[in-house]
């Protein structure tokens, strides 16, 4: 455990940030799973609507540095290709 006051503060801030990031990451994964579920169900309209929402969330997380920009691009490209196949 930290003995210096500033180190204690940093430990508290770090834990708070870790919990917030975990929450944001979980929320992002939920949006991604919604798109996969809609694609698996074969519902093109629902999958496109879910994709639009997922895209916003993933881009926001990439811009904040929670995930790498390339990972966001990979998620979007992979899901867009699957939705395109539904036609």
From Swiss-Prot:
One of its GO terms (biological process) is translation. Pfam families: Ribosomal_S20p. It comes from the Bacteria. InterPro entries: Ribosomal_bS20, Ribosomal_bS20_sf. GO terms for molecular function: small ribosomal subunit rRNA binding; structural constituent of ribosome. Keywords: Ribonucleoprotein, Ribosomal protein, RNA-binding, rRNA-binding. SUPFAM superfamilies: Ribosomal protein S20. Residues 1-11 have a biased composition (Basic residues). Belongs to the bacterial ribosomal protein bS20 family. Binds directly to 16S ribosomal RNA. This is Small ribosomal subunit protein bS20.
């Amino acid at each position: 455990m930290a003995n210096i006051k500033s180190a204690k503060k940093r430990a508290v801030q770090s834990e708070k940030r870790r919990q917030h990031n975990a929450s944001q990451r979980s929320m992002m994964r939920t949006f991604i799973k919604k798109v996969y579920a809609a694609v698996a169900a074969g519902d093109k309209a629902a999958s496109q609507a879910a994709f639009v929402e997922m895209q916003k969330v993933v881009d926001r997380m990439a811009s904040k540095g929670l995930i790498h920009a390339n990972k966001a691009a990979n998620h979007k490209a992979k899901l867009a290709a699957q939705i395109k196949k539904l036609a």
